[in-house]
């Protein structure tokens, strides 16, 4: 009988103990899932956040919205520029440049007075040359004698002026060259050369006459040149028997002309301290000869 209550108490204690033991077990089980659930839910929330953040990237609709740039219809609308080019081809009436070819006869017409002006200029130049030649015929005799003196000395001729006379001739020559314009000095040099050649021709002609006079049997007769070398008259007035002295040179006289011209260009400018144009050294043969 005593064992029964003891067993009953043991049963009660066992039941209470089992209940007491069972109660914390479910609490631990509840705590474990609760701890695991937040751990599992956190990455889900983060993934949702990343997914929520990544969602704005696909909606890049504002960038495709500025697709009006490829549409560039406003620029295509600006195609009226080829259309307004019509007025530009329309003002092509400027092409009829008829007024320009029309005034051409006007230019051809005034060419006639230009030719008249050229004739007048040529006449004036001829008149000036004639006046200058007349002046040179009277004034350049001293310069001719200076150059002839240097030529005779270079060739060992006996026809040499005295020193006092030569100094006076030098002074007179320089005075005349100083009065001649610079543009006319080249012509003056050529006239001096021409006068020297004529003088040499005249001297050679006189020598031939003297030789012929020494031959009594010679039937060849020469007329004396008419005032070929008058005193104070400047250049010679050649006779009709000496056509080469009429202001024109023969080709065989070219070396003689060049020699005397070079001598004159070396002597006169340095002696008188005057400027001679450079073209005077290359002027054509006989272009400034007297007529």
Swiss-Prot record:
Residues 32-55, 105-120, 227-237 have a biased composition (Low complexity). Substrate of transglutaminase. The keyword Signal applies. Coiled coil: none annotated. InterPro entries: Bifun_inhib/LTP/seed_sf, Bifunc_inhib/LTP/seed_store, Glia_glutenin. Residues 32-120, 227-250 are annotated as: Disordered. The keyword Glycoprotein does not apply. SMART domains: AAI. Pfam families: Gliadin. GO terms for molecular function: nutrient reservoir activity. Residues 238-250 have a biased composition (Polar residues). Residues 1-20 form the signal peptide. Keywords: Allergen, Repeat, Seed storage protein, Signal, Storage protein. Residues 56-71, 81-104 have a biased composition (Pro residues). The alpha/beta-gliadins can be divided into 5 homology classes. Sequence divergence between the classes is due to single base substitutions and to duplications or deletions within or near direct repeats. There are more than a 100 copies of the gene for alpha/beta-gliadin per haploid genome. Belongs to the gliadin/glutenin family. Gliadin is the major seed storage protein in wheat. This is Alpha/beta-gliadin A-II.
């Amino acid at each position: 009988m005593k064992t029964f209550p003891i067993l009953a108490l043991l049963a009660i204690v066992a039941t209470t103990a089992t209940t007491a033991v069972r109660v914390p077990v479910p609490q631990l089980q509840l705590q474990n899932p609760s701890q695991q659930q937040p751990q599992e839910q956190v990455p889900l929330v983060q993934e949702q956040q990343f997914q929520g953040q990544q969602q704005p990237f696909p909606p890049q609709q504002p960038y495709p919205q500025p697709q009006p740039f490829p549409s560039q219809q406003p620029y295509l609308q600006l195609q009226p520029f080829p259309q307004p080019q019509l007025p530009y081809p329309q003002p092509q009436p400027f092409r009829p440049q008829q007024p320009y070819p029309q005034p051409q006869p006007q230019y051809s017409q005034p060419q006639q007075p230009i030719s008249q002006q050229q004739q007048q200029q040529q006449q004036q130049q001829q008149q000036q040359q004639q006046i200058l030649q007349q002046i040179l015929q009277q004034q350049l005799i001293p310069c001719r004698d200076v150059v002839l003196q240097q030529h005779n000395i270079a060739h060992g001729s006996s026809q040499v002026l005295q020193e006092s006379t030569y100094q006076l001739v030098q002074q007179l020559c320089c005075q005349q060259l100083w009065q001649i314009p610079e543009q006319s000095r080249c012509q003056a040099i050529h006239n001096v050369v021409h006068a020297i050649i004529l003088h040499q021709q005249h001297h050679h002609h006189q020598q031939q006459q003297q030789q012929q006079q020494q031959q009594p049997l010679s039937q060849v007769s020469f007329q004396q040149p008419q005032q070929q070398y008058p005193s104070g008259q400047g250049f010679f007035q050649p006779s009709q028997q000496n056509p080469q002295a009429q202001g024109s040179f023969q080709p065989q006289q070219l070396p003689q002309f060049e020699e005397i011209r070079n001598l004159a260009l070396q002597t006169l400018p340095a002696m008188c301290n005057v400027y001679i144009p450079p073209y005077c050294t290359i002027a054509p043969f006989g272009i400034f000869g007297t007529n």
